[in-house]
A protein has these predicted regions:
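Conserved beta-strand termini and adjacent loop/short-helix elements that scaffold enzyme active sites
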Residues: 30, 50-52, 109, 141-146
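Hydrophobic/aromatic residues located in beta-strands of well-ordered beta-sheets
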Residues: 27, 77, 105-106, 140
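Sec-exported extracytoplasmic/periplasmic mature domains
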Residues: 39, 43, 82, 98-105, ...
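Catalytic His-Asp segment of secreted/periplasmic serine-dependent ester chemistry enzymes
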Residues: 118-177
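Active-site segments of SGNH/GDSL-like serine hydrolases
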Residues: 96-123, 147
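Short, flexible active-site-adjacent loop segments at beta-strand->alpha-helix junctions, enriched
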Residues: 83, 112, 144
Length: 177
C-alpha cells in the first residue's frame, strides 16, 4: 500500500499544472459591495460569486491562488474591485493574470464612483486597461463607460439600484459568455 501512495503524494506535492480539459467551466466573480448588490442577479445567470464589503483589489491575488490550488478556479474569472480607494498595483494584476494561466480568461471590470472622486476612479480604470493590454488572457469590461448616463442605475453614484443590478448582471453576462 505504501509503495502505491508514495508516488501519488510526490506528484501532488510538485504541483503539476492541470490540463485545460480539467479546469472547471463557468464563471467565478470576485467583488466588493458593488457586486454584492447584484449577487442574486449574477448567480441566476450562472456565476459563482465571491463578494465582501470593502474588499480591496490586492485581496483577489490570494483568492485566485487558493481557488487554483484547490482545483476550484473556473475557466473565466471576473474581478470588479478598486472602488474602495487603495490603488491597484500592477504587480497584483500581473500576478492574477499569471496565476490564472493561459487556459483561463480574466475579466477586469472598470469602476464607477461619485464625481467627488474622479481622480481615483480614473487611476483605477487606467491601471486595469494597462493590465489588460499586458496580458493575452486578460480583458477589460468597461462598466464605467457603459453605465455613464444611467443615473437611475445607482443610488449613490456607485452602488446599484434594482434596475442597475439587472443591467450590471446582463452586461457582465454578455461580455463573459
Amino acid at each position: 500500500m505504501r509503495k502505491i501512495l508514495l508516488p501519488v503524494i510526490v506528484i501532488l506535492s510538485v504541483g503539476i499544472a492541470a490540463p485545460a480539459h480539467s479546469i472547471p467551466g463557468g464563471r467565478y466573480a470576485i467583488g466588493d459591495s458593488v457586486m454584492l448588490g447584484a449577487k442574486a442577479n449574477l448567480t441566476a445567470r450562472g456565476f459563482v460569486v465571491d463578494v465582501k464589503k470593502s474588499r480591496q483589489f490586492y485581496e483577489a491575488v490570494g483568492i485566485v491562488k487558493r481557488k487554483k490550488a484547490h482545483g476550484l478556479l473556473r475557466r473565466k474569472i471576473v474581478i470588479h474591485l478598486g472602488t474602495n480607494g487603495v490603488l491597484i498595483r500592477a504587480s497584483d494584476c500581473d500576478t492574477i493574470s499569471r496565476v490564472a494561466g493561459r487556459h483561463r480568461r480574466v475579466f477586469l471590470v472598470t469602476v464607477t464612483g461619485p464625481t467627488k472622486y474622479p481622480k481615483i476612479r480614473k487611476a483605477q480604470n487606467r491601471r486595469m486597461r494597462a493590465c489588460a493590454r499586458r496580458h493575452r488572457n486578460t480583458r477589460l469590461i468597461d462598466w464605467y463607460r457603459h453605465s455613464r448616463g444611467h443615473g437611475n442605475w445607482f443610488y449613490d453614484g456607485m452602488h446599484l439600484t434594482t434596475k442597475g443590478r439587472r443591467a450590471y448582471a446582463g452586461y457582465l453576462d454578455r461580455h463573459t459568455s
